[in-house]
């Protein structure tokens, strides 16, 4: 049996159907990211985050970036099977390129008014993950590190990085956080290489109930709002509960928007923040009050902008160039086919 996530649903179904549950999970994680930034960016409108949203965002922390990283790890067997050269070109095209391009675009949006002297700290900060695009930078580093450790056993290496995360100072963005997330990445990779276990985990009601109990205990006893090894039980439990639910309903017509969001995750991720930021700045200039309404409008606008661009991407080379490197840098060395919805969805985060 091929050690890929495809074995979860079972043989006999097309490859696309076998990935539906993962697309749903990515969609859920992306919407959680959008809501988080719609709340945190209220500060640019001189407004406070509503307590209810603050609580929701805190509870959803393990369902945002950690879930996306875990899912990226699940796709590793398929990625590395392409060979080192195609693997590297694909990741640079689908992750490295949008990171650099949107770092520049975001810098152009954020920089006006700061003055030329601000460039001395702004440029290095942005290029080292000092913006919302840090996730893409970290993911690119994880893909590079995966080549180094690809011949080593996954779980022992993951354990080493969990120890490093525990030893690192708490809440350090470039120490504790990447070590913890890379451990999750390796854990997802290991699961993908054990399709029987993965199949059982996402199908078993008993496993889902046990995971829900662990998740509840984690929320009650641990700080789940931070990326660190102490959040590992709750993070894995939350991912399992969501995977169980997604697996059962993934092909529902009602979830088509979530699947679409998940398949085009890189588009929604890079687009949402600038849209929300600009709207918050405009709201501040207009003296708009009402944080709840502003969160709803800005999050809705960000998702709408992402949807429009995701729909346009397979039809427009110009739009496609906003998210994927030119064809000669792609994994196959050829431009993305115009009829491929969302381009190469399995290489996006």
Task: Tell what function each PLM region has.
Residues 31-38, 102-104, 159-173, 210-223, ...:
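Aromatic-anchored segments of alpha-helical transmembrane domains
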Residues 197-259, 274, 281-282, 289-292:
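Alpha-helical transmembrane segments and terminal signal-anchor/GPI-anchor hydrophobic tails
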Residues 15-16, 79-86, 150-153, 192-205, ...:
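Membrane-interface junctions at the ends of membrane-embedded or membrane-associated helices
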Residues 65-78, 135-147, 174-200, 232-252, ...:
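Specific transmembrane alpha-helix
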Residues 42-46, 111-116, 168-171, 218-225, ...:
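Juxtamembrane "helix-exit" motif on the non-cytosolic side of transmembrane helices
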């Amino acid at each position: 049996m091929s050690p890929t996530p495809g074995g979860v649903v079972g043989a006999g179904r097309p490859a696309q159907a076998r990935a539906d549950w993962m697309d749903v999970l990515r969609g859920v994680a992306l919407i959680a990211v959008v809501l988080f930034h719609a709340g945190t960016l209220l500060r640019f409108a001189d407004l406070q985050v509503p307590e209810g949203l603050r609580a929701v965002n805190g509870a959803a922390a393990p369902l945002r970036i950690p879930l996306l990283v875990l899912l990226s790890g699940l796709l590793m067997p398929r990625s590395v099977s392409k060979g080192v050269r195609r693997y590297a070109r694909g990741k640079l095209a689908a992750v490295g390129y949008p990171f650099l391009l949107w770092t520049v675009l975001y810098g152009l949006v954020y920089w006006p008014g700061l003055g030329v002297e601000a460039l001395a700290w702004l440029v290095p900060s942005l290029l080292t993950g000092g913006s919302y695009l840090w996730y893409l930078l970290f993911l690119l580093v994880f893909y590079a590190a995966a080549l180094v450790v690809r011949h080593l056993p996954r779980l022992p290496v993951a354990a080493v990085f969990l120890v490093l995360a525990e030893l690192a100072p708490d809440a350090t963005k470039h120490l504790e956080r990447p070590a913890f997330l890379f451990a999750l990445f390796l854990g997802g990779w290991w699961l993908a290489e054990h399709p029987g276990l993965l199949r059982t985990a996402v199908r078993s009601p008993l496993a889902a109930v046990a995971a829900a109990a662990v998740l509840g205990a984690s929320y009650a006893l641990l700080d789940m709002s931070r990326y660190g090894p102490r959040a590992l039980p709750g993070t894995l439990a939350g991912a399992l509960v969501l995977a169980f639910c997604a697996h059962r309903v993934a092909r529902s017509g009602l979830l088509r928007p979530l699947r679409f969001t998940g398949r085009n995750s890189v588009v929604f991720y890079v687009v949402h923040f600038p849209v929300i930021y600009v709207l918050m700045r405009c709201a501040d200039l207009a003296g708009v009050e009402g944080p709840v309404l502003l969160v709803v409008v800005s999050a809705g606008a960000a998702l709408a902008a992402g949807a429009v661009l995701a729909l346009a991407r397979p039809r427009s080379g110009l739009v496609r160039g906003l998210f994927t490197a030119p064809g000669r840098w792609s994994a196959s060395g050829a431009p993305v086919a115009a009829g491929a919805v969302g381009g190469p969805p399995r290489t996006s985060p």
